[in-house]
UniProtKB/Swiss-Prot annotation:
Pathway: Amino-acid biosynthesis; L-histidine biosynthesis; L-histidine from 5-phospho-alpha-D-ribose 1-diphosphate: step 1/9. It catalyses: 1-(5-phospho-beta-D-ribosyl)-ATP + diphosphate = 5-phospho-alpha-D-ribose 1-diphosphate + ATP. Keywords: Amino-acid biosynthesis, ATP-binding, Cytoplasm, Glycosyltransferase, Histidine biosynthesis, Magnesium, Metal-binding, Nucleotide-binding, Transferase. The gene is hisG. This is ATP phosphoribosyltransferase. It comes from Buchnera aphidicola subsp. Baizongia pistaciae (strain Bp).
């Protein structure tokens, strides 16, 4: 049985967000033994319990206050909000943080042999989807009349099977659409993974754990977005070197032993350092340029 004194987190058991969610908790220093056979896992070093469930159950578990925190895709979250609004059910939650994984878009796609000029080409058509409420909201805004064909999987095969004229489904790279003779024509919703929290009373003990967890999550994301840069540069070119390194904090500048014309620069940059930038740095006289990943970061 899950203790009321421990923070309860719901995450996807298997699927698109599962591995990234597990990796996030691990990088946050939470020691937890997650198995596919287990519904609940208990952290060893923090008062945290993790429930591994279907992704479309997570919003409801948070909104019904069964768990305190959920890691979920915004597409699933928004679909459940719209569903609960129709059912006149509670759909309250607090979004704590958008994450840096689970990036996708919900799009309309049509067979490649169909002429498409604008959204009204889909008027009075049948559209297959796993997201009927998001689709309806978008089509209502566009004043589009359509018939929904609800499918819980393999939506991309619906036109070829004669079930629909078009589909509304998640797209990451577009490779699945192309493999099934479809092309993306409209994006109706952009989505990333996010951390959500229940509304209402939360004990001080749990609030402290949430604050600690969110600080660590922010540190993990910041570290993944940043690089540690070290280089040697001519003193007279320092300003030009800094101008090339957009997104970098004020550098640490150190004297080089036996060289009064050059210094060592150490800095954290929040932007990707491309080969072209490194080549420009070299033209300015920089040398020994190192770009290193950052494992952990706290501001």
């Amino acid at each position: 049985m899950i203790s009321n004194n421990r923070l309860r987190i719901a995450m996807q058991k298997t699927g698109r967000l599962s591995d990234d969610s597990k990796d996030l908790l691990t990088r946050c220093g939470i020691k937890i033994n997650l198995h596919k056979q287990k519904l609940i896992a208990f952290a060893e070093n923090m008062p945290i319990d993790v429930m591994c469930v279907r992704d479309d159950d997570i919003p409801g578990l948070v909104m019904d206050k069964v768990v305190d925190i959920g890691i979920i895709g915004e597409n699933v979250l928004e679909e459940e909000v719209l569903n609960r609004q129709v059912q006149l059910d509670n759909c309250s939650y607090t979004k704590l943080k958008r994450l840096d994984f689970g990036i996708c878009r919900l799009s309309l796609a049509v067979p490649i042999n169909i002429e498409y000029n604008n959204i009204h080409c889909l008027n009075h058509t049948r559209i297959a989807t796993s997201y009927p409420h998001l689709l309806k909201r978008y089509c209502d805004k566009k004043k589009l009349t359509f018939k929904s064909c609800m499918l819980n999987g393999s939506v991309e095969v619906a036109p070829r099977a004669g079930l629909s004229d078009a589909i509304c489904d998640l797209v990451s790279t577009g490779a699945t659409l192309e493999a099934n003779g479809l092309r993306e024509v409209e994006v109706i919703f952009f989505s990333k993974a996010c951390v959500i929290c229940k509304t209402g009373f939360i004990s001080l003990e749990k609030k402290n754990v949430i604050d600690k967890l969110m600080t660590r999550i922010q540190g993990v994301i910041k570290a993944r977005e940043s690089k540690y840069i070290m280089l040697h540069a001519p003193i007279e070119k320092l300003e030009k070197v800094m101008n090339l390194l957009h997104g970098a904090e004020n550098p640490t500048i150190l004297k080089l032993a036996g060289d009064n014309t050059r210094v060592a620069m150490h800095m954290v940059s929040s932007e990707t350092l491309f080969w072209e930038t490194m080549e420009k740095l070299k033209l300015l006289g920089a040398s020994s340029i190192l770009v290193l990943p950052i494992e952990k970061m706290m501001e």
